Each structure stands twice: as C-alpha cells, then as structure tokens.
Regions:
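N-terminal Rossmann NAD(P)H-binding glycine-rich loop of SDR-like oxidoreductase domains
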Residues: 4-23
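C-terminal substrate-binding subdomain of Rossmann-fold SDR/epimerase-dehydratase oxidoreductases
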Residues: 20, 182, 189-301
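NAD(P)-dependent short-chain dehydrogenase/reductase
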Residues: 111-118, 143-219, 247-249
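Conserved Rossmann-fold NAD(P)-dependent oxidoreductase catalytic core, especially the SDR/UDP-sugar
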Residues: 83-131
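Conserved catalytic Lys-bearing alpha helix of Rossmann-like short-chain dehydrogenase/reductases
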Residues: 79-85, 137-145
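NAD(P)H-binding glycine-rich loop region in Rossmannoid oxidoreductase-like domains
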Residues: 40-79, 91, 108-109
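Active-site helix of classical SDR
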Residues: 133, 137, 176
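Adenosine-cofactor binding site in Rossmann-like domains, unifying the SAM/SAH pocket
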Residues: 24-45
C-alpha cells in the first residue's frame, strides 16, 4: 500500500504523531480539518483525499472521572464518528481499514482461567462501568469492521492495544493525560515529598509505548499481504499500578512517598491480554522496555 494513499484520522494525537515519523507521506487529519461527527464533512474528506487505506485513530477520549460523569456523550459521539468514517470508507471503495480499539473495552470480569484475554472474548461480558459508553462504542466499531470484512472480503480489521504512554501525550490537559504521563507529571511536580494517586495501586496493567503501536499500525498499513484478523497489541508483562509508580520514581531518580486514595475508583482489576496473534503476524517485533520508555517520557514532562 502506497503511503500517499493512506488517510489517518486523529492524526494530530499521540499515536498519530508517532505515525507521522514513520509514514510521513500519508495524510494526517485532526478535528480542526474535518468534523467527523458530520457525515457531509466526512464525505468531503474522502472526496478530497481519495485514500486506499484508512487508519482510524480519532475518538472522544477522557479519564475515569470524565467517563463516569458523561457516558452518553462518549457513547453517542464515538458511535456517530465511527459509523460516518467506516460507512463512507466502504461506500467509496477503500480496500483497507484499520480501526483502533482498546483493551479497556474487554469484559469487566472473567474467570481466572480466561486471562490473558484472547480476541474472541471481546463480547463475553459487558465492559467495566467506568468505561461503559466508550467501551460499547468501540466494540461496535469492531463489529462494523468485522461485518464488512466477513461479507465483502475487504481487509477491514481492528487492532486492540493495551494502555499507552508517550512523550506526545497531553501534558497540559490533566483530563486527557494517560495514566503513566499523569503519574510522571505528579512525580516531577511534587514539592512536599508525596505523590497522590487514585485507587489502591493493586490493579494490573499492560503498558506499551505509543511508538510501538504506531510501528505495528504502519506495518499493517503498508504491507502487501492482507491482515484480515483482529489482534491485541500488548507486551507480556502485567505489573500493578503500584509497581508502575515505583518504576516511575526510579526513572525520575526521586525518593518520594506514593500516597494512594482508596476512596477513588480503581477501574478494572485486571485486563491483561494475549499477544499470540500479534506474534504470529510479526514474530520479530520487540517492545520498548517500560524502564526505557518511562525515562524517555519523564525527560519530556
């Protein structure tokens, strides 16, 4: 697939910025360029760019508190945006579509022997209440792509990444920062020897640097072979939030007290995923270590 025929929505966000370094000849659009919630704007975008491949990163996102307070907005805004983009791509004859989901949309609770979660478990139960609206909107994006692939043979599929972090995160907006970035910012800004954190520190999380996700997306977008399957993008390790915070202190070389507020929500206790399909597609891929990634991001905070 030629780079100059690739359209990236959400192209000015965290993952999009890493993709700009990897496939610079693609077309990257942000919310200021086209309103993806407006079907006429979306149709105009496809008429202007005429892509053969779409990488759909654009989404309404927010932290736990924002998702809890506004589940309907996260459901409706993402449903409309995703439907507009996928339907128009299909109608315009786009041959490859890569939708980006998230492991946070997997079922809130499964049996212990169902972890790490494989892709076929995505609909085995409802998503966590703290991501209810967002979770179902992303699931329907995956269903839309599956239906087109199964009925037409087009290379439409979903990539399901675990938690992300990057030096391109929203450092200036506390409501949009990802967990690792918010943690490192609190560590750097601490003046009283304390780092206040939500929850208990017990939940388990898989973290990957956003550049690693971008590399995998770029390989899928430009490869000659069809992918034709959904797959998780995650590393093998699943440390606790406490362990991640301790690693953040080490990366920052600061001796501070981690103070968890157990009255605040934890979110899902665990959502570790299986990466067997990823390893089959790209057996030689190696993830950046959490230690090195934290150092990179801390130096940019």
């Amino acid at each position: 697939m030629r780079e100059d025929r690739i359209l990236v929505t959400g192209g000015t966000g965290m993952v999009g910025k890493h993709l700009q370094d990897l496939i610079p000849n693609a077309t990257f659009v942000g919310s200021k360029d086209y309103n993806l919630g407006n079907i006429f704007a979306v149709q105009a975008m496809f008429n202007d760019i005429e892509p053969d491949c779409v990488i759909h990163l654009a989404a309404k996102v927010g932290g736990i508190q924002d998702n809890i307070a506004n589940p309907l907005a996260f459901l409706e805004d993402n449903l409309v945006m995703n439907t507009n983009v996928v339907k128009t791509a299909h109608d315009k004859g786009v041959s490859r579509f890569i939708g980006i989901l998230s492991t946070c949309i997997y079922p809130d609770r499964l049996e212990d022997d169902q972890y790490p979660m494989t892709e076929d478990l995505l609909h085995a139960g409802p998503p966590t209440p703290t991501n209810f609206g967002y979770g179902y909107s992303k699931r329907m994006l995956g269903v839309h792509l599956d239906t087109i692939r199964n009925s037409t043979g087009k290379d439409y599929f979903s990539i399901i990444p675990s938690n992300l972090y990057s030096e391109y995160d929203h450092f200036g907006d506390d409501t949009k920062m990802h967990l690792v970035t918010a943690l490192l910012k609190k560590i750097k800004n601490s003046t009283n020897g304390i780092v206040p954190l939500f929850g208990t520190g017990l939940p388990l999380r898989q973290f990957i640097h956003a550049e690693d996700l971008a590399k995998i997306i770029a390989m899928c977008a430009t490869r000659k072979e069809q992918t034709m399957t959904n797959f998780n993008v995650c590393c093998d390790d699943s440390p606790s939030i406490l362990e991640i915070a301790e690693a953040g202190l080490k990366a920052a070389n600061r001796d501070l007290e981690l103070q968890f507020d157990s009255s605040k929500p934890d979110g899902q206790y665990r959502k570790d995923c299986d990466n067997t399909v990823l390893r089959e597609l790209f057996p030689d891929f190696r993830f950046l270590s959490l230690e090195e990634g934290l150092k990179r991001v801390y130096n940019k905070v």
